[in-house]
Design a protein with these regions (language model features):
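Extracytoplasmic "Venus flytrap"/periplasmic binding protein-like
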Residues: 13-84, 117-128, 220-223, 229-230, ...
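Glycine-centered hinge/linker elements that transmit conformational signals in sensory
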Residues: 139, 179-210, 264
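Extracytoplasmic "Venus flytrap"
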Residues: 1-9, 30
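Extracytoplasmic/periplasmic solute-binding protein
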Residues: 95-104, 110, 134-182, 201, ...
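Extracytoplasmic/periplasmic substrate-recognition and gating elements
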Residues: 12, 16, 22, 202, ...
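Short, well-ordered beta-strand elements
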Residues: 1-2, 21-26, 49, 100, ...
Length: 278
């Protein structure tokens, strides 16, 4: 979403180098892509090549995925994996030791994006922990502004945010729980769910957040309208600085534009932890 011009450039470059291949493409929000992919795969009508996030979704489609290892060895040699980020490859290695995908990119989730014109207007500093975040959001609300915006209608941003909270509290327990080795009733994980719930009850997230999607309902408010002080999203949103859309250019690069991106200390213990995704 929001990357159409970059995608067009990549497609044009690919077709220039491979004139015998024509690519048919459709742009859609990521959530719609996932739902369509489920239907198309079940019907045997899916694209030959598709992209998904690592983790549960990557494993969910395993019955439809082919081991790419022999193709990669044939094309690039036995040391083909060294061409990719080691951490990204570790996320893609199947339980059988095979690879059913290769990395398209590695980015960080769990960031808070801030439009500093709102902070300057009300004389506020960027919050560094949850207690400060509550106070900042209260000030924004008291002045008729939005607090921290999230498109909680979409499951992926909820998962990204909760994982960031859980990783901030205890990274080892988070990934141990994902592997089924630590129960989700562990006190640190319970605390992460409590903080997540508190974001709604403490007024940190905007009212009605569960009924609003990320792309493009929430992202347009921050990126194109410049009408909200803060939004949760990943590092991939840096592409907005190069977006050719006139509204985005004005918000991000216009006179006086000033945006910050930072990670939150959710449990007030003085440390932060991003969630990584391939």
């Amino acid at each position: 979403p929001g990357d159409e011009e970059y995608t067009h450039a990549m497609l044009e470059k690919f077709e220039e180098e491979h004139p015998d291949i024509q690519i048919d493409y459709t742009f859609m929000p990521y959530t719609d892509h996932v739902e369509k992919l489920k239907v198309d795969l079940s019907a045997g009508d899916a694209a030959d090549v598709y992209g998904v996030q690592t983790g549960a979704m990557y494993k969910e489609f395993r019955d439809f995925e082919e081991d790419l290892t022999p193709y990669l060895v044939k094309e690039y040699g036995d040391d083909w994996a060294s061409n990719y980020n080691e951490y990204a490859m570790s996320l893609l290695k199947g339980d059988d030791g095979e690879y059913y995908a290769v990395p398209l990119g590695l980015s960080y989730a769990g960031y808070v994006w801030a439009n500093m014109k709102y902070f300057d207007k009300y004389g506020l500093e960027l919050p560094t922990n949850y207690d400060e975040l509550k106070e900042v959001c209260k000030t924004f609300r008291d002045n008729g502004e939005y607090p921290l915006v999230i498109g909680a209608k979409d499951s992926w941003i909820n998962i990204d945010t909760w994982m960031n909270i859980a990783a901030d509290i205890n990274t080892e327990k988070l990934y141990s729980a994902i592997e089924g080795e630590t129960p989700f009733t562990d006190e640190d994980l319970v605390q992460s769910f409590q903080i997540w719930q508190n974001c709604f009850t403490d007024g940190v997230f905007q009212d009605g957040a569960l009924g609003v999607g990320m792309y493009t309902d929430s992202t347009d408010m921050y990126q194109k309208e410049g009408s909200v002080p803060m939004i949760l999203n990943g590092s991939w949103s840096l592409g907005a600085y190069m977006d050719s859309d006139e509204q985005s250019q004005e918000v991000y690069n216009g006179e006086g534009a000033n945006h910050k991106i930072f990670l939150m200390d959710w449990n007030n213990d003085g440390k932060i932890a991003p969630v990584e995704e391939a």
